[in-house]
Amino acid sequence: MRRVLLGDQATPSPHLTAKGRAAPSQPAQAVHVHVAPEAGLAVPDVYFSAGYGHADSWASGGDWVLIEAFDGRWQMPLHLRSVDGGGRDAASPYGYSGVYAHPELTERDVHAAWTATQAALRDLGAISVVLRHSPLVPQAPLLPEHQIVVSGHPTRLVEIPDEETAWSAMEGRSRTAVRKATKSGLVAIVRRADTTDVLGSGSFRLLYSDTMRRRGAAPAYHFGDDYYSALLDGLGDNLLTAEVRGDGGFVLAAALLLQHQDRLHYHLSGSAAGAVRTGCTNLLLWEAIRFAARVGLHEFHLGGGIARDDSLYQFKRSFGGREVEYRMSGLVLDERTYHQRVRARAAILGVTEDALLQFGFFPAYRAEMP
């Protein structure tokens, strides 16, 4: 893990180049690359944290870095991954991070931070960067060169002033499912996760893996022991588990939840085959909302689906809250090398470079067969 610190943050507009080479006549300080992040840096959400980033590196196969400036008012967590043919590229960790820019940063500050960030990434050998922009924390404005990869992707944010208000805000069908589950004897609990929850033989692990297999999920949604162990080690008490048990204590549904300050995130979940009709997942999410209300959390981010009209998003919508939009962007940092890698990938796929670029995947050299 590395933290990239951009310049002298007391200087309003640092003019930086890689490896500390300040441009002539400019009073900028060096770009410093540290072996590990300094302890105590406040992050705006869990997806910016070293604990989460280190865990996600087991899934992404990359090296986690945090680019940070202005005493933490500019933060960009990334994974650096090797690229076939040489070089590396960067991408936000799985989830919701992007580029945090504190609202107090001026336009000049933001411009300086973007300039220094690009220089630092090039110095780290990055050909391109993919950013997963959080709808929950203030984001830096995009540069004109950014390519929009995903826009208008809906996710649900449930605000929790208190339990009664949250219950009233839910759609009737979801409340009915919760009542049905409770009446049939299902019991839900939310607690701090422990080692037994992340073991391969734990209820959550078994249910999640089985659910992903039933849905034919891509390999990126299957996680190994190292990932879960690192997640528990990195987040500690901020990693929670939710369970719903039926007759005989059999676990019908389970989830991992991430806590950060007054916000809860619905991270991963699974359920037993055929158990959905019992209302177990409705009860699980309602218990998470109740837990949040009890301990003083005010937001529960459920994430989204593929589109507004798909069944997963409609299910999450039934818990009330409001829609917030997630987006992804891409930025080419080394045009020459980028196009070399795209041409090489196009040749492997048997298409032209233009056809691969028009396919819409970013970075294009990581695209699968169109």
Predicted region positions:
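Active-site/acyl-donor-binding loops of N-acyltransferases
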Residues: 1-30, 80-83, 142-165, 297-370
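Short, high-confidence coil segments that cap the C-terminus of an alpha-helix
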Residues: 62-64, 123-126, 295-297
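Short, flexible active-site-proximal loops enriched in glycine and acidic residues
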Residues: 86-89, 124-128, 149-151
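Aromatic (often tryptophan-rich) hydrophobic motifs at membrane interfaces
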Residues: 113-116, 227-340
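A conserved beta-strand-loop-helix scaffold within acyl/acetyltransferase catalytic domains
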Residues: 2-85, 133-157, 161-277
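Conserved acyl-donor/pantetheine-binding loop and adjacent beta-alpha core of acyl/acetyltransferases
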Residues: 82-96
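A gly/proline- and charged-residue-enriched helix-loop-helix capping module
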Residues: 92-140
